Structure formats: C-alpha cells, structure tokens
C-alpha cells in the first residue's frame, strides 16, 4: 500500500512537471496557460489509459463477479489517491494562471477555483472520503469485478481532454474536433452511463436474476453508491449532448447559408 501510494505521489506530479517543461521547449510560442492546460490534460489522459487497462484486466480475470479477486482492484485505488490530490493542485494552477493578469489575492483565486470547479471538486472529494474507504475496507473480499468496471469509466477521459486542448488552442472549427466530439459522446454513454446497467446485468447473470430484479436483491448501500456515482455522469452527459447539438447545428447553419 505505502509503496503504491508513494509511486503515485511521484508519478503524477512528476509527469505533470515533465509535460510542462517539454511543452515550453517544443512550443515556445505557447502561453503559460496553454502549457498548463495541455499538460494537465495529458496527465489526465495517461491516468485514464492506466485505469482502463487495470479495469479491463480485472474484468477479464474475474469469472465470478462477486467473489473472484484480482490485486489491481485494490492496488490501483491506492495509486489513484495521489492522482486525485494532484488534480486538485493542477486545476488550481490553471485557475491561478488564467486570472494572473487580474492581480487577485490568493483567497479570491481559491474561492473562484472552488466555484468554477465545484462539480469536479465535489466528485474528487466524494471519491476520496467515501468511495475509497468503501472500496478498500468496507466491501471486504467481494466485488473486485465491479471495481474493475468503475475503472473502465475513464475510457472517455482522453477524448474529453483532447476536446479541452483543442478549445484552448482554438481548433473547434476542424474536422478532428467534430470527430472527437462524436467519440466523446459515444464513449461517455457506454463507459459512464450504460456501465451501470451492465454491472447490474452481470450480477443478475451470476445469480440467476433478471436486470429488473437485481436492485431489489442487493444491499441498499450498493444502490446508493451507484446512484452517487451516476448522478454527476448524467449531468455531464447532458452537457456533452447539448454541446454536440450546438456544434452540429452551427455547422449545418453555415452549410445552408
């Protein structure tokens, strides 16, 4: 546990610092804000790829979705904790850089950061304070398969990150941005929304229950935890769909015009 925590604490901030240094050298014309935004998104994408790999490994290895074990289901959570803490700092750095010209006090910057990123801050805080203890201690030796499923939700993150990078670099007019938008919505739908019915279905297959019977045959806290997890995903998905609709409506209007 301690070695994994230490590895994460070195890996993510180190990768962030290396990314910023490399971007400054490779793209000297970029602003500090550009480098910070791209560097932050690169680290997020690397974490997402690692999480997805860990999740798929656990899912494939666990034939019994309730009782089978895989060491990555526990160890990757310890590796993820430093990332969550690092991500708070990275988001704060981006906010501080964005408002640098306004000469704001640190207290004002922190307040603005918490307001602008309130959903993401809440998401990370809930994971650290509630879901990590549940995953690492309270669930005992059960449910590694479902932990692996949750890891695979990160598959959509690289596409979300690429979209944010392209917006920062003012590349919204390109075909790549539109294609990436379709991939973002698709991966988000399958890996962050439909993932939850899939987990219920998998449990039902193991226990001989239909999908609709599963919620009434598992502990209440499992349903509550899933509700907490899926709620922000539904909100983010609605935002993605609205953004995608505006993007293609604009493109259609330009074509008709």
UniProtKB/Swiss-Prot annotation:
Keywords: Cell membrane, Membrane, Transmembrane, Transmembrane helix. InterPro entries: TLC-dom, TLCD. One of its GO terms (cellular component) is plasma membrane. It is found in: Cell membrane. It is a multi-pass membrane protein. Disulfide bonds: none annotated. The keyword Membrane applies. The chain crosses the membrane at residues 1-21, 42-62, 71-91, 114-134, 142-162, 181-201, 220-240. Residues 33-249 form the TLC domain. Interacts with GGT7 isoform 3 and SLC3A2. PANTHER family: CT120 PROTEIN, TLC DOMAIN-CONTAINING PROTEIN 3A. This is TLC domain-containing protein 3A. The lineage of its organism: Eukaryota, Metazoa, Chordata, Craniata, Vertebrata. The gene is Tlcd3a.
